[in-house]
C-alpha cells in the first residue's frame, strides 16, 4: 500500500488537550465537534479551537444533533450555526449521523438508528437535499452502532446509506468501529457488511474503541482500538487503493477524560503501522470482543 494513503490521519480535538496542542510543534488533521461551539459567539472554547485549527494540517467538522432522520422539522437556527462554523474553519468535510435524536418534542441524547425502509430513505434524502442547499456545502452521513433492530427493516445498512449518497450527492463517513460493533451484535460478518458500503462515496473514516457490556459490544470511545477493528480498517484502505488511490481522512476518536494527548498520538501512529505492516503496536488484542484488561 502506498504511504500517500496516510497523509490524512488525525484525531478529534478535545478541550482537555488545548494547552498541549498550543505547545505542539505541528498539528495533524483535527476533527472539531460542532456542538461544542455552535452556540458560542466568543469565549475561550472558540478562541482556543480557532487558534489550534489555524495550524492544523486540515479540519473536518462533525456534529451530533442534526436529527437528520427525525420527524421534527430541521432546526434552521442549528443549520445557521453550522454554516457559521463552516465559514470560520473551512472544513473539508461536514458531517453528522444517520440517525434520529428527537421525537414528540423530546430530545434523546443518544444516536438512535433509523428504520431502514423505503419510506425512511425518501425522507432522509429530502432532508439531506435541504441541508446541502442551506449550507452550500456537501453534507456527510455517518453510520451509527446498533443494539436493536426493527421489524420493518428491509434494507441492509450499507445499501441504505449508499443509496442516500448516490441520490443526494452526500458523502459517507464510514465508522469502521460501528460496522464492527453492529456486525458482532447481530452475528454478522464485519467485512461482508463493510463491503455493502459504496467506498467511492466515502470521504472520511472513523476508528475508535469499544467495550463489552455483558453479552454485546458497546461503542464507548474510551479505550484502545482493538486489533480486529484496525484490521478491518486496513482491509478498507486496501480497497481504496485498488479502487481509486484516494486519500481519505482517518480520524481516531477517544472521549476518555483521562487519556493524554501523547498516548492518543502514539495509538494513531501504531494504527498506521498496523495498517501498513500488520504490526499490532499498542493496539489491544481482540477476537471479536475486547481484551481482558477492558480495552
Question: What spans do the regions from the language model cover?
Answer:
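C-terminal helical cap(s) of enzyme catalytic domains, especially alpha/beta-barrels
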Residues: 258-281
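Acidic/histidine-rich catalytic cores of soluble enzymes
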Residues: 132-216
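Gly/Pro-rich active-site loop or hairpin
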Residues: 39-42, 73, 111-121, 182-241
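Acidic-and-aromatic substrate-binding clefts and catalytic sites of carbohydrate-active enzymes
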Residues: 16-19, 34-47, 67-77, 147-155, ...
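Conserved, mostly hydrophobic/aromatic
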Residues: 30, 94, 175, 205, ...
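Active-site acidic/histidine proton-transfer and metal-coordination neighborhood
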Residues: 75-171
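Boundary/entry segment of secreted carbohydrate-active catalytic domains
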Residues: 1-20
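Acidic (Asp/Glu)-rich catalytic clusters
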Residues: 20-26, 43-61, 77-92, 129-134, ...
Amino acid at each position: 500500500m502506498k504511504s500517500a494513503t496516510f497523509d490524512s490521519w488525525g484525531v478529534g480535538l478535545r478541550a482537555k488537550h488545548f494547552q498541549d496542542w498550543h505547545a505542539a510543534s505541528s498539528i495533524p488533521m483535527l476533527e472539531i465537534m460542532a456542538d461544542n461551539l455552535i452556540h458560542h459567539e466568543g469565549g475561550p472554547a472558540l478562541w482556543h479551537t480557532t487558534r489550534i485549527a489555524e495550524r492544523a494540517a486540515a479540519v473536518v467538522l462533525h456534529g451530533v444533533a442534526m436529527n437528520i432522520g427525525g420527524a421534527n422539522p430541521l432546526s434552521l437556527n442549528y443549520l445557521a450555526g453550522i454554516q457559521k462554523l463552516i465559514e470560520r474553519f473551512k472544513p473539508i468535510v461536514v458531517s453528522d449521523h444517520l440517525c434520529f435524536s428527537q421525537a414528540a418534542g423530546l430530545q434523546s441524547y443518544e444516536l438512535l438508528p433509523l428504520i431502514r425502509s423505503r419510506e425512511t430513505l425518501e425522507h432522509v434524502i429530502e432532508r439531506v437535499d435541504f441541508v446541502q442547499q442551506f449550507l452550500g456545502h456537501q453534507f456527510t452521513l455517518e453510520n451509527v452502532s446498533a443494539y436493536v433492530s426493527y421489524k420493518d427493516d428491509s434494507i441492509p445498512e450499507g445499501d441504505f446509506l449508499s443509496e442516500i449518497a448516490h441520490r443526494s450527492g452526500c458523502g459517507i463517513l464510514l465508522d469502521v468501529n460501528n460496522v464492527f460493533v453492529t456486525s458482532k451484535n447481530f452475528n454478522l460478518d464485519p467485512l461482508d457488511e463493510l463491503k455493502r458500503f459504496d467506498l467511492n462515496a466515502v470521504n472520511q473514516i472513523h476508528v475508535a474503541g469499544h467495550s463489552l457490556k455483558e453479552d454485546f459490544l458497546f461503542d464507548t470511545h474510551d479505550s484502545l482500538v482493538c486489533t480486529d477493528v484496525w484490521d478491518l480498517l486496513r482491509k478498507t484502505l486496501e480497497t481504496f487503493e485498488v479502487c481509486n488511490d484516494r486519500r481519505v481522512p482517518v480520524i481516531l476518536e477517544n472521549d476518555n477524560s483521562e487519556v493524554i494527548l501523547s498516548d492518543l498520538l502514539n495509538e494513531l501512529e501504531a494504527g498506521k503501522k498496523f495498517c501498513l505492516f500488520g504490526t499490532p503496536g499498542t493496539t489491544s488484542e481482540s477476537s471479536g470482543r475486547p481484551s481482558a484488561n477492558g480495552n
